[in-house]
Amino acid sequence: MNTIAFIPARANSKRLPKKNIKKLNGVSLIEHSVRFAKTLKFVDDIIISTDDKKIIKLYKKSKFIKLFKRPKHLATNKSETISVITHTLKKYEKKFDTTDTVILLQPTSPFRSNKVLRLAYNIYNKLKKTKSVISVSKSNNSLKRNFYIKNKYLELVGKKNKKHKNIYQVNGNFYIGNKNFLDKYKSFYYTKKTIPIILKSGSLSIDIDTKEDFDKARRT
């Protein structure tokens, strides 16, 4: 089984320019994800997809990284991560190997736990056929897509269950999905088919999209 750690790093960010190469505790956000991926013994390859010239220069000679330059049509504010993954994996599989499992590690989540990821991966491996596991935390934003948990699976909060006691939101720390799942649902999430891992630590739930988020991470 070939397991890929996938790190997407677009050059231009509307709300926080050049965020992927901004340094947190002396280390760029993308390098935080790269270093974490290297600690995962079950990962066979680390892929970076980017259109950022500085990131390309930084990793093009790395023996640990499979670097893929992202085309312009997949490097806009409207580009979906799943489209980037699909496009990149086609190139990867032609050149290297087939893919069974994708672990998405976004540079915007610099704080991660190896223990938690191993737990999530073990749960993922016990699932059958089409499967995915993603990280969530208690919801504090009614504007985001909110979920509740039923029979261990995530379900989207709708009009009929808005008053559900425990509501969660995807926090972006990690996503795990097999390639069949991604090809079929075009997402790491599908109702009644995705297992959530609840992160209680505040730092693990930090997702850097704005200057305020970055300042919060610096204080952590």
Predicted regions and their residues:
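N-terminal nucleotide-binding beta1-loop-alpha1 segment
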Residues: M1-P17
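A short, N-terminal amphipathic alpha-helix
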Residues: L29-D44, K57-L58
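Short internal beta-strands
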Residues: E31, I46-T50, S135
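Short active-site oxyanion
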Residues: F42-I47, K131, S203-L204
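Short phosphate-binding loop-to-helix
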Residues: I47, K53-I103, F111-L119
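Hydrophobic helical membrane-anchoring modules
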Residues: K184, I198-T220
